[in-house]
């Protein structure tokens, strides 16, 4: 095993026990080779083993192999159901998942779950399928940030979406955007914060940007940038130190391959050592202070089968105090282990000098022979072979024997809240009970560890105070506050307009709303909003509407079918008659999809035009014109004619002077007969017709006379 070592000086001044200088040490080594030369693979540390998943081989061909490293050797694990390259792997709730990726035919927009002897697809409906993305898990959710969504050969920008898959609800959601479009970034998630370094951004552009993302509140902050630009590296994180290994690192006009940089005190620093085999687009897992790097492009851009380790050694980090308890002339301190070789405890009071004790490699200690009623100040300092680490915060305690305050947790329900609590130290005597105060009103709840508050008022602030007591006395107060909530009850109103409809709602509780509009099982709209109305622009039709109100208590769903058509008004018809032909035309009516024309109760046509001409039948003709759509028909516009095609429209007589004309309104066909004077033109027409008829009679009589003779 080869080994290179660097001691990088870090100026950290320790208060206890004397001034000293702390160091950081990096080492690199090569371990057992992996079974195949791979690049663009993904990996995870799961069940005490290293899983190396997918990637591309020496022939740039995506593979479905899964290799497992256990007890110092590699073996072939259950293969993926299909080849994947540039996927992401994460462990959530003791389960291994593989997310996204691509192969020679497609981008995989889903998640594979490891089931011990194989893999199964649990979803394939990622909103934006990607590869080369950032993948991690938090709070039973799998996060997918950025990545590439293009399967061609052109250089296109990656995406910047934050896509989240909820393992409890089996649903995807896009919750926001990263500050940049990112792919093939180096990243590490420490359980609460995601550190992101470099990556490809616009097309083939590398970036020097460094970000921290907090999934708890979906926020980003920027850290000082790298000295150069980078993509395809891996990121380690240990005891608050972040370090970047390998990748395409371009600085001062040249690519520096295999570089190792670390971030300290607001500055990126070069360690001046490199990977023993410089790599890009490798994959890695962090196990304690060791970052294990697998595969990647090696020298000459040839996929490597190297398994390398970069180890970081630090003075121990600052210990976190777990508890401090006062007893009779004693103080017991407990702290969380920092992997130190041992610990010093220093304690003092305002009336005594400092006392330092080397307590060895333990995580609790009881200081004895103290004076009751005197406040003591205590500090823990870790140490190892590199020196003293960062001291803990100074804590104080007064020897006594009452309990420590209990730790309270609140689970908010629908107009209720469940309080649970537990003790950190009972003072050396059994806990006898608890006093519970709600907004200042207290009761003795006895020796229980949970209590349910009911009939709460939504939106009201409740302050909970809890005191534990034993036979010596009461603990100090433990306090927590919360705002009561209820499920949102919805009242929904729809206003139909010409170019769409407005969905408006009232809610009894503040919530986020998800409005979904679909038609024939096709989702046309899915929008998340905090507003209480939304205008939906769609054509006329029948739609399924779903409105969900989501808050801390739960989800309220309101669903209904909307028949989106409006009642058209009666058309206003212009008409004219030429001999036996009537011509109709009208203006377009809002809400109408087509028009119906009846003559004497018989449908003549169904037309989408605004004009129509047809021949009248002999005798009286009553014409009705309707504006209609799939669900509504207007009142008719009626044109009535008796024999000589004399027409009256909507109860308003058209002054054509022909006797014996019956007037029919648009709403009433029983109007009385009217007699009007005939004008000159009409009289000439009548006389002409009469003369022609007489001539025809004379011709017929003459023919008969000739035949007779």
Swiss-Prot record:
Residue ranges of domain Fibronectin type-III in the record: 315-405, 406-488, 489-566, 568-643
Keywords: Kelch repeat, Repeat, Signal
Pfam families named in the record: fn3, Kelch_KLHDC2_KLHL20_DRC7
Kelch repeat start and end residues: 49-94, 96-140, 141-192, 193-240, 242-288, 290-340
Ranges annotated as spanning the membrane: none
Record's signal peptide: 1-22
SUPFAM superfamilies the UniProt entry points to: Fibronectin type III, Galactose oxidase, central domain
Keyword Repeat in annotation: yes
Superkingdom of the organism of origin: Archaea
Protein name in UniProt: Kelch domain-containing protein STK_09390
């Amino acid at each position: 095993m080869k080994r290179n070592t660097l001691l990088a000086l870090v100026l950290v001044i320790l208060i206890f026990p004397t001034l000293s200088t702390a160091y950081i040490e990096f080492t690199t080594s090569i371990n057992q080779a992996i079974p195949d030369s791979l690049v663009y693979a993904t990996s995870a540390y799961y069940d005490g083993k290293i899983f190396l998943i997918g990637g591309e081989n020496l022939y740039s061909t995506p593979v479905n192999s899964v290799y497992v490293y256990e007890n110092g050797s590699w073996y072939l694990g259950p293969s993926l159901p299909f080849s994947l390259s540039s996927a992401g792997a994460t462990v959530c709730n003791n389960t291994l998942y593989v997310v996204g990726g691509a192969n020679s035919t497609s981008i995989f927009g889903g998640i594979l779950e490891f089931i011990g002897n194989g893999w199964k697809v649990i979803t394939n409906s990622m909103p934006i399928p990607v590869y080369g993305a950032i993948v991690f898990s938090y709070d039973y959710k799998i996060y997918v940030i950025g990545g590439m969504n293009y399967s061609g050969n052109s250089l296109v920008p990656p995406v910047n979406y934050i896509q989240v898959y909820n393992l409890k609800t089996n649903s995807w959601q896009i919750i926001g955007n990263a500050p940049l479009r990112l792919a093939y970034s180096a990243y590490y998630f420490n359980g609460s914060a995601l550190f992101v370094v470099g990556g490809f951004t616009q097309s083939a552009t590398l970036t020097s940007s460094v970000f921290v993302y907090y999934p708890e509140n979906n926020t980003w902050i920027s850290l000082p940038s790298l000295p150069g630009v980078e993509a395809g590296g891996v990121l380690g994180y240990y005891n608050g130190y972040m370090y970047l290994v390998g990748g395409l690192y371009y600085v001062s006009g040249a690519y520096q391959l295999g570089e190792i940089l670390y971030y300290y005190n607001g500055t990126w620093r070069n360690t001046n050592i490199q990977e023993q085999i410089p790599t890009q687009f490798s994959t890695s897992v962090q196990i304690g202070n060791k970052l294990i790097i697998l595969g990647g492009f090696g020298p000459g851009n040839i996929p490597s089968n190297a398994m390398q380790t970069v180890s970081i050694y630090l003075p121990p980090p600052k210990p976190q105090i777990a508890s401090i308890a006062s007893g009779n002339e004693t103080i017991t301190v407990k702290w969380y282990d920092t992997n130190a070789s041992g610990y010093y405890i220093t304690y003092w009071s305002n009336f005594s000098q400092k006392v330092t004790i080397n307590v060895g490699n333990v995580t609790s200690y009881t200081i004895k022979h103290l004076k009751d009623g005197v406040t003591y100040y205590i500090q823990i300092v870790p140490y190892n072979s590199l020196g003293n680490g960062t001291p803990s915060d100074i804590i104080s305690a007064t020897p006594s024997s009452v309990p420590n305050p209990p730790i309270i947790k609140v689970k908010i329900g629908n107009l209720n809240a469940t309080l649970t609590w537990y003790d950190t130290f009972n003072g050396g005597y059994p806990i006898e009970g608890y006093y519970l105060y709600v907004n200042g009103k207290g009761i003795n709840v006895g020796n229980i560890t949970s209590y349910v508050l009911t009939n709460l008022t939504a939106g009201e602030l409740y302050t909970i105070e809890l005191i534990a007591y034993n036979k010596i006395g009461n603990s100090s107060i433990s306090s927590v506050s919360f705002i009561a909530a209820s499920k949102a009850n919805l009242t929904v109103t729809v206003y139909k307009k010409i170019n769409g409809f407005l969905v408006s709602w009232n809610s009894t509780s503040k919530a986020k709303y998800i409005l979904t509009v679909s038609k024939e099982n096709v989702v046309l709209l899915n929008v998340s909003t905090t507003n209480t109305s939304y205008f939906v622009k769609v054509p006329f039709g029948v739609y399924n509407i779903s409105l969900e109100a989501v808050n801390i208590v739960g989800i309220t769903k309101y669903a209904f079918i909307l028949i989106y058509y409006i009642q058209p008004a009666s058309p206003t018809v212009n008409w004219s008659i030429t001999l036996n032909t009537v011509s109709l035309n009208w203006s377009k009516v809002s809400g109408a999809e087509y028009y119906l024309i009846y003559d004497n109760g018989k449908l003549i046509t169904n037309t989408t035009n605004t004009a129509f001409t047809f021949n009248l039948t002999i005798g009286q003709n009553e014409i009705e014109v309707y504006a209609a759509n799939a669900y509504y028909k207007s009142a008719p516009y009626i044109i009535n004619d008796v024999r000589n095609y004399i027409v009256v429209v909507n109860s308003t007589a058209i002054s054509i002077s022909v006797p014996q004309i019956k007037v029919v309104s648009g709403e009433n066909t029983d109007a009385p007969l009217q007699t009007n004077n005939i004008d000159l033109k009409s009289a000439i027409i009548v006389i002409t017709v009469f003369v022609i008829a007489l001539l025809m009679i004379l011709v017929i009589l003459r023919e008969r006379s000739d035949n007779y003779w």
